């Protein structure tokens, strides 16, 4: 099996093989790497998913559409799709990153998938990238049930406290470890009344805050 199996699963044949190689090149390997392609692919992905949701759910308000999109483009979802494509087997990583398990790291795999979207956009244009993304995300889009979609934990916690005329929670960064693109965050969620403090961990501040908020909700509703 070669890296071309990834392109085949994406149903795209690269005219510019250098773009394909760069999309699979982590910054630890050297330059050029996939960081700029990941930036581009992130924007393409956001737009394609936003447009798909807009047309699929004509009656949903903006807030619900935003939450659905956030759920679809989050790191966990991209990581799962990258595993299905076996991207990790073909990543070009520096020796240290390779030894530390970088080929299985969720953030690296998610970034590489977005880089591939960016590479396809540059290689063949927007319609080609849109077709690849829509096909890859079709099962996830088909499974969406907006009527059952739940607001994120921070929003639900805020609404629970507001409904009881309580002060809003405060989120504090306790610790951030790791290199810039591989950081782990520890966030505390503190509630004044009823007195409660929970801690969440994640690969971004947003994820860590959501984890801490979810823990607080479980405590309050227990």
Curated annotation (Swiss-Prot):
PROSITE patterns referenced in this protein's UniProt entry, alphabetically: DS_RBD, RNASE_3_1, RNASE_3_2
Gene Ontology CC terms, in alphabetical order: cytoplasm
Keywords: Cytoplasm, Endonuclease, Hydrolase, Magnesium, Metal-binding, mRNA processing, Nuclease, RNA-binding, rRNA processing, rRNA-binding, tRNA processing
Domain (DRBM): residue spans on this chain: 152-222
GO molecular function, one term: double-stranded RNA binding
Catalytic activity entry: Endonucleolytic cleavage to 5'-phosphomonoester
Coiled-coil annotated spans: none
Similarity comment: Belongs to the ribonuclease III family.
Function: Digests double-stranded RNA. Involved in the processing of primary rRNA transcript to yield the immediate precursors to the large and small rRNAs (23S and 16S). Processes some mRNAs, and tRNAs when they are encoded in the rRNA operon. Processes pre-crRNA and tracrRNA of type II CRISPR loci if present in the organism.
Protein name, as recorded: Ribonuclease 3
Naturally occurring in which organism (per UniProt): Dechloromonas aromatica (strain RCB)
UniProt lineage: Bacteria, Pseudomonadati, Pseudomonadota, Betaproteobacteria, Rhodocyclales
